[in-house]
């Protein structure tokens, strides 16, 4: 949050000083920093360069690793996340009309500052890889050259671990309607708590077993066309192959968004309606 300017300059200096002290004292030869929003920092803030310089002063060489989803899936996840923090009143179709044109989903452009700062040391892992059935974590460890050291420490439970579960269609639509009613302005504390209540309520009743899938075929087609050239450049640079040869799409499934009308209760929950 310091690097992306959500904290003031003094806190930014303090955070970087703490990181520098850790790097100076650690006996480790590998340090991992993980933050999803690293991928969308404004170039003006020079986050890759700041980190590369800081690490270099302590004898570390920056590498960039990223997990890649098709833009349509990433946009659905972004929409569900906004619902999870009760910050979205638009339908998915309306969300796509503005967000679907955002340059933050141009992966080739977003990666370029990190590629330069890391002197080309980039590991790009497809969320689903046509070339491998191995779990994502195993592929990430191998891709970073840490397989021999870490693979013996990773059991089946580690490889299958999931966190930050995405909201499903019931919680997403409930959040959207509550936002439009202004309920988010009446919450004490972070409104993410309200989103978690919606998720927990749905999951406890056997609802939302699947993550949200928006109903906007025309918008998703425009998204695919808009980013096709950038994806081709990205795939050629990272894998030396075409995008479709590496990236496996999500299994085909119909939209489950409920914005078009009231949700029909699931059989298990019908008695509670």
Task: Mark where each language-model region is.
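Anion-recognition interface
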Residues: 1-273
């Amino acid at each position: 949050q310091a690097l992306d300017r959500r904290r003031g300059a003094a806190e930014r200096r303090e955070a970087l000083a703490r990181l520098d002290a850790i790097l100076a004292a650690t006996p480790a030869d590998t340090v991992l920093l993980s933050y999803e929003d690293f991928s969308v920092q404004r170039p003006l803030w020079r986050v890759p360069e700041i980190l590369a310089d800081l690490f270099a002063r302590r004898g570390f060489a920056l590498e960039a690793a990223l997990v890649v989803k098709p833009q349509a899936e990433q946009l659905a996840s972004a929409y569900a996340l906004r619902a999870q923090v009760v910050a979205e009143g638009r339908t998915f179709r309306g969300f796509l009309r503005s967000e679907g044109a955002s340059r933050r989903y141009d992966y080739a452009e977003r990666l370029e500052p990190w590629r330069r700062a890391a002197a080309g040391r980039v590991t790009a892992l497809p969320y689903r890889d046509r070339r491998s059935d191995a779990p994502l974590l195993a592929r990430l460890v191998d891709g970073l050259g840490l397989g021999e050291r870490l693979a013996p420490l990773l059991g089946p439970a580690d490889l299958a671990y999931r966190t930050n579960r995405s909201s499903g269609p019931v919680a997403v639509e409930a959040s959207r309607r509550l936002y439009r009613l202004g309920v988010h302005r009446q919450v004490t504390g972070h409104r993410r708590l309200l989103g978690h209540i919606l998720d927990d309520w749905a999951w406890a009743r056997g609802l939302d077993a699947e993550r949200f899938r928006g109903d906007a075929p025309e918008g998703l087609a425009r998204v695919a066309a808009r980013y096709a050239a950038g994806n081709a450049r990205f795939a050629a640079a990272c894998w030396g192959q075409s995008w479709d040869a590496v990236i496996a799409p999500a299994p085909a499934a119909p939209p489950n968004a409920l914005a078009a009308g009231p949700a029909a209760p699931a059989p298990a929950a019908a008695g509670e309606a």
